[in-house]
């Protein structure tokens, strides 16, 4: 058990701490006297200071913050993706045209009545 002196000392320390906290609170209240306290706004409430209202433009709070950020960041990425798809599609079209031309040229060569071009195959023929 504590003695009466120790209890009295503890009570005195607690009172001093409480007084210091009260003094700090009073100083903060005096400092913030001219400023209104910031309170959370509802969706429909917008706080405009009194006086010249044109000078202060009210920014509406972003209700769907994550959605807004995703779409703001996603737009350039989506644009790049679309450009890449267009570019890749164009490259594929060009390759398909080249392939079609080669296939047509080979098939036309087989069908055509023109004599084949001299390929020098007969020069290396070992027939007597």
Curated annotation (Swiss-Prot):
Cell cycle keyword on record: yes
Region listing for Disordered, in residue ranges: 107-128
Stated role: Regulator of mitochondrial apoptosis and G1 cell cycle in breast cancer. Protects the breast cancer cells against mitochondrial apoptosis and this effect is mediated through the modulation of BCL2 protein family, which involves the positive regulation of anti-apoptotic member BCL2 and the negative regulation of pro-apoptotic members BAD, BAK1 and PUMA. Required for the normal cell cycle progression during G1 in breast cancer cells through the regulation of CCND1 and CDKN1A. Regulates the level of PP2A regulatory subunit B and PP2A phosphatase activity.
Protein's recorded name: Protein BEX2
Species in which this protein is naturally found: Homo sapiens
Region (His cluster): 117-121
Residues where Omega-N-methylarginine is found: 50
Tissue-wise expression: Expressed in central nervous system, with high level in pituitary, cerebellum and temporal lobe. Widely expressed in breast cancer cell lines.
Similarity-based family: Belongs to the BEX family.
A GO biological-process term: regulation of cell cycle
Gene Ontology cellular-component terms listed: cytoplasm; nucleus
Intracellular or extracellular location(s): Cytoplasm; Nucleus
Underlying gene: BEX2
Alphabetical keyword list: Apoptosis, Cell cycle, Cytoplasm, Metal-binding, Methylation, Nucleus, Zinc
InterPro entries cross-referenced by the UniProt entry: BEX, TF_A-like/BEX
Pfam families (alphabetical): BEX
Keyword RNA-binding found: no
